[in-house]
Structure formats: C-alpha cells, structure tokens
Regions:
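A short acidic, Gly/Pro-enriched loop at the edge of an enzyme's catalytic core
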Residues: 82-93
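Class I SAM-dependent methyltransferase SAM/SAH-binding core
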Residues: 32, 38-83, 109
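Conserved alpha-helix/loop element of class I SAM-dependent methyltransferases that forms part
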Residues: 10-29, 44
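Conserved catalytic loop of SAM-dependent methyltransferase domains
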Residues: 40-41, 166-206, 210, 226-230
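A short beta-strand submotif of the Rossmann-like class I SAM-dependent methyltransferase core
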Residues: 96-99
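A short glycine-rich, Lys/Arg-flanked "PGG" loop and its adjoining helix->strand segment in the class I
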Residues: 108-123
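C-terminal lobe and adjacent flexible extensions of AdoMet/dcAdoMet transferase-like proteins
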Residues: 213-239
Length: 239
C-alpha cells in the first residue's frame, strides 16, 4: 500500500485537498495527523510547510515504523483517536483522513477528542468514505465499516462543538463507474474475495485520473459538489 500511496492519483488528490485547506497559516504552526498510516501525508506536509511542527499518531506500530523511515522530523506516537495523548488546545490543525470509518472507532468520541486537542479557532480537516451504495469489497479489504452523507458529517461535527466551514463530496466525476465496480465487487465478496481498489495503474491512466481530480478540486473551491465517493470537511473549534 505504501508504494501505491506515493503515486496513486486518489492519494495525490486527497493530499492536494488537505494542503489547499490548511492554507493560509503562519510560517510556524502545529499539525496532528490523527491516523497517519505510513506517513504519506506527513511527508507532503513537510515539503509544503518546512517549518511546521508535525505530529503523527496511529494505532499500528507497523505504521509508525513506516512513518519513521520517511524522516519527516515529525513526532510519532502509537495511540488511538479515542484518547489522544496531548493536552487541551495543543494543535492549530488536526487531520483525520479516512480513520473514523474503521471498525473499532467510535466516531462521536473521536470527534470530541479531536475538538479537545485543537486550540480555540483551530481547524479540523476530515475525509470520510461516502454513501452506503458505494460499499464493496474495497471496504472489507481496508476495514471500513461505515460510510457517510453530508448531513451525517455535519451532525457529527456540530454535535462535538465544531463550526463547519466547508462540506463537500469529491471524486464526483468517477462516481458512476466506481459504483458499478463496487456493485460487481459485492458479488466477489459473496464468494469470499476482498481486494482493495487501490492497485497500480498504467501511468497514462493514473495521470489522466489525477488531471480529472485536479480540475474537480478547482471547481470544489467555489461550490459544494452534490455527490462523490468521499465527503470532505473543514471545521473550526469556536474561539
């Protein structure tokens, strides 16, 4: 997965969404990637914001070891999103990218804990899988047990005390073909096969999909897309 994460168009698009949503910030600010995985997002943040104070946590020790290999200079800790080992108001920005969808995660508790560690006025950047009709073998393969709609995400965040600033679906262009692929994959799942959709693509196809995603990102800066395979939110802690 780490090798795919480096170049795969979807990860590239998500990282662009995140960086675009973090800006503007002062030259020095603090970021927590709560569920940092193998560290692809932390590496991107180090390139984009060289003086940022980066921290990553993950429940997997293997993920933390992979992060260390990237030499991002981030503080790395093994921890879960239910009990973040930081004081209240410790961070300017918290990222949670496709973590709350996972088995064993209480999304409401994670939202409240994220709110606690943000400073007043701090920003949460959140990405979650969208729409139950897009559930397929990919979800089973990556351990995702829930998908969300925009109203559900708004209710979740506002219930934790956040003010929602931006809430949009994304990857709208590819939703119809992905829906078909996921429907077919549910038949495979019935036969006991569960494989992630994220596999290496021919370079020309990967580049074309990255281009489509970049165009959509430009559009989503000015409007909220009505559907997509993921829902993306930016929310602030009052203060």
């Amino acid at each position: 997965m780490r090798s795919v994460e480096e170049s795969y168009w979807w990860y590239q698009a998500l990282r662009r969404h995140v960086v675009d949503s973090i800006r503007p910030q002062p030259e020095t600010f603090s970021v927590l990637d709560a569920g940092c995985g193998s560290g692809g997002m932390l590496a991107k943040l180090r390139r984009e914001f060289p003086r940022a104070d980066l921290t990553g946590i993950d429940a997997s020790e293997h993920a933390i070891e992979l992060c260390r290999e990237r030499n991002t200079g981030a503080q790395l800790l093994r921890a879960g999103v239910h009990e973040l080992p930081f004081s209240a108001g410790a961070f300017d920005v918290v990222l949670s990218l496709d973590v709350w969808v996972n088995a064993g995660v209480d999304d409401a508790l994670a939202a409240h804990e994220t709110h606690r560690v943000l400073r007043p006025g701090g920003k949460l950047i959140l990405n979650l899988a969208a729409f139950d009709f897009l559930r397929g073998a990919h979800d089973e393969a990556v351990g995702a047990v829930r998908r969300y709609t925009r109203p559900q995400v708004r209710a979740l965040l506002e219930g934790a005390g956040f003010a929602v600033e931006r809430l949009t679906y994304w990857n709208a262009t590819l939703t119809p073909p992905i829906a078909l692929v996921r429907w077919l994959s549910r038949r495979q799942l019935a036969q006991g096969e569960a494989r992630s959709d994220f596999r290496p693509l021919p370079p020309f196809l990967n580049a074309a999909l990255a281009g489509l995603a970049a165009l959509e990102l430009t559009a989503s800066r000015h409007l909220s897309l009505p559907f997509g395979t993921s829902v993306f939110a930016v929310a602030r802690k009052h203060g």
